[in-house]
């Protein structure tokens, strides 16, 4: 009998610890162990891996990660009610589960890795998922401390992460992701898989960081994409005026049609614009402010 067989069913755990999902924390619990195993396997072979999990809740995905061979799981949980349930899993897998009670937006996990390369696997709380992803993709220095991100999002958000030009979902999030990583949707998850069921379909995505992304200052890319997509219906010669430099000069330098709109420009085009903007403001290309 394996350690996971010694643990009570998740529904019993939820009942025993009074773990009704809290909307304020963006909680939707996954109880189907076949599904949690599928999510865990989506990150690749787990034997010997160090995994960071955000928002484990009662520990359905945590169990799967450990049962599939993760050497160590570092679980960051904000909800104090869930800690006792996670401690039960830790007891079943001695020395392999470290529980950090805290807000993942504020916790620096790197000191807990002991120099090991880690991957992130998580059913992210819906209310902070995008903010967490942006933080991870903005990591400095780069390459980052993680080798991959396997994450659950609302389907609409997942589409915004992986979108390409000429689509309604394409925007700032897709440009940031495409600059620093390669992302794809692995599969969808129906609302009925969760307790309580959300109103929308969810998707699991897999993100692999690029070892050497095009040099660019993050702050310049953020300003350019904010200006361009903030007025996405306007031509770039108009929308980029808010940058405080001559937009026609930027577009001419980068060879981009001045009548183009934001959704028509690929990631490489935005990186070229950001670097041209950096030079125009006197910051250079890929300077220390987030390069």
UniProtKB/Swiss-Prot annotation:
Keywords: Cytoplasm, Methyltransferase, RNA-binding, rRNA processing, S-adenosyl-L-methionine, Transferase. It is an enzyme of class 2 (transferase). Disulfide bonds: none annotated. S-adenosyl-L-methionine binds at residues 28, 30, 55, 77, 103, 123. Its EC number is 2.1.1.182. GO terms for molecular function: 16S rRNA (adenine(1518)-N(6)/adenine(1519)-N(6))-dimethyltransferase activity; RNA binding. InterPro entries: KsgA/Erm, rRNA_Ade_diMease-like_C, rRNA_Ade_Mease_Trfase_CS, rRNA_Ade_methylase_Trfase_N, rRNA_adenine_dimethylase, SAM-dependent_MTases_sf. It holds the Pfam family RrnaAD. Specifically dimethylates two adjacent adenosines (A1518 and A1519) in the loop of a conserved hairpin near the 3'-end of 16S rRNA in the 30S particle. May play a critical role in biogenesis of 30S subunits. Belongs to the class I-like SAM-binding methyltransferase superfamily. rRNA adenine N(6)-methyltransferase family. RsmA subfamily. This is Ribosomal RNA small subunit methyltransferase A. It comes from Azorhizobium caulinodans (strain ATCC 43989 / DSM 5975 / JCM 20966 / LMG 6465 / NBRC 14845 / NCIMB 13405 / ORS 571). The lineage of its organism: Bacteria, Pseudomonadati, Pseudomonadota, Alphaproteobacteria, Hyphomicrobiales.
